[in-house]
């Protein structure tokens, strides 16, 4: 299926993967985007289009994570544009539908795990004063992180142990204690081991 969206001034066409098709679908889509030779402002638009497409899906589609990671690896401005697009999403979470919030939360976890977005993107989050929909968003995001390959989760969150990330580390620890650990223990106890590893990553390295 082809989804065509028209960010000014040129069309950006993304291809959704068919269940019977292979991983070349996101590679093909990334190639098509690259061939558009988008300028700086247009790359920011492309990042927002990616989030919009993902958010509109009925369920999370890994295609967008694979495509986003590949584009971020090739286009620095698009990577920054994606980070800025997420910052805007963080401010508007209370108005987002549950399925949009869930899709974008899972996408963020996948992008962090694939080193497509930096952990520093989370520094703007007010961990001590989250609204209900934001709590849901971050519960979904961290639950998705816990389900990644252990090496991916470690790579995504290891910077929490660095002195420069002390404030973010404190915020994440607060969120884990208030909102993530109770959820895991109640609904997904199979993730307890992964949660313990995440908690270990919040212990500063001397």
What are these regions (language model features)?
Residues 1-62, 80, 188-200, 204-206:
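Long, low-complexity, highly charged intrinsically disordered regions
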Residues 24-33, 44-49, 62-67, 77-85, ...:
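Short sequence/structural elements of tandem HEAT/ARM alpha-solenoid repeats
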Residues 35, 52, 56, 69-73, ...:
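Positions within ordered alpha-helical repeat solenoids
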Residues 44-109, 113:
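Helix-rich alpha-solenoid scaffolding regions
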Residues 96, 104, 109, 123, ...:
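C-terminal transmembrane helix pair
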């Amino acid at each position: 299926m082809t989804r065509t969206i028209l960010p000014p001034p040129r069309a950006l066409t993304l291809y959704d993967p068919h269940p019977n098709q292979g991983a070349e679908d996101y590679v093909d889509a990334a190639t098509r985007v690259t061939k558009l030779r988008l300028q700086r402002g247009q790359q920011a638009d492309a990042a927002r289009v990616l989030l919009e497409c993902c958010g509109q899906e009925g369920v999370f589609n890994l295609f967008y994570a694979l495509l986003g990671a590949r584009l971020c690896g090739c286009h620095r401005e698009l990577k920054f544009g994606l980070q800025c697009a997420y910052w805007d999403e963080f401010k508007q979470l209370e108005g987002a539908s549950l399925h949009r919030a869930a899709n974008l939360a899972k996408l963020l976890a996948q992008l962090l795990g694939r080193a497509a977005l930096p952990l520093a993107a989370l520094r703007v989050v007010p961990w001590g004063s989250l609204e209900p929909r934001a709590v849901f968003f971050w519960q979904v995001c961290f639950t998705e992180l816990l389900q990644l390959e252990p090496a991916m989760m470690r790579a995504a969150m290891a910077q929490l142990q660095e002195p420069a990330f002390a404030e973010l580390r404190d915020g994440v620890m607060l969120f884990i204690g208030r909102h993530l650990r109770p959820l895991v223990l109640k609904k997904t106890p199979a993730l307890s081991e992964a949660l313990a590893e995440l908690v270990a990553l919040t212990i500063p390295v001397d």
